[in-house]
């Protein structure tokens, strides 16, 4: 509201959103409120905000507040991979962790549903989101570390920003359905209630452990172990300790998780008890993997 009240913004012909996810989502609100066209210029590849018709807003303590649904997505997204390559590597790293959630979360949310055209397209496209991250992720991080806008970095940036963003647009509406996110993000939404975790670790970093939790809950152990090995290879978390959560924190995370929209998006009924156990079991699998390396 403060930005939208500025005279230079009111008098502008269009809104340019330059920066990361929170800057972009702020501009979505401004563009919607002032009925101005929005163009996005992501300076990092840490999420799909530059492409989506959804905004995520947070409280001052970094805990999740609510979603905002503009009437349309940004008109165009401009990606300069050299800018991405010169951004902090840890943001690309966290972006990989966040994007790893798209395929498994959409699949879980849409399983058993008779989907109409648009969300069916989203589910089909979600299947394209994981493999590029696993195939190119490690090399992309190396290129980012060297500030090189190579092909691997481009493939990963496009996956994080564009592929997952298009899936989000196809699987999310303000009122009809929300198949965009599930248990992996439930771990993230609970983590800020544990200051050591929520304040010290990036969104995608925590979500990447949430992916292992979701796949454990879903008993998809083969896929979990594949992504666990990938996480370990690039330094993404595979244990609770790596995101500063302890056994005593799990119920707090689960209690918060059960209150968010993502908990209710699947035809499957989730329980807090099983969710806590899935976090424990994912942690045990991660510890075992690391011990054997």
Descriptions of predicted regions:
Residues 32-126:
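A glycine/threonine-rich phosphate-anchoring loop and its flanking beta-alpha core
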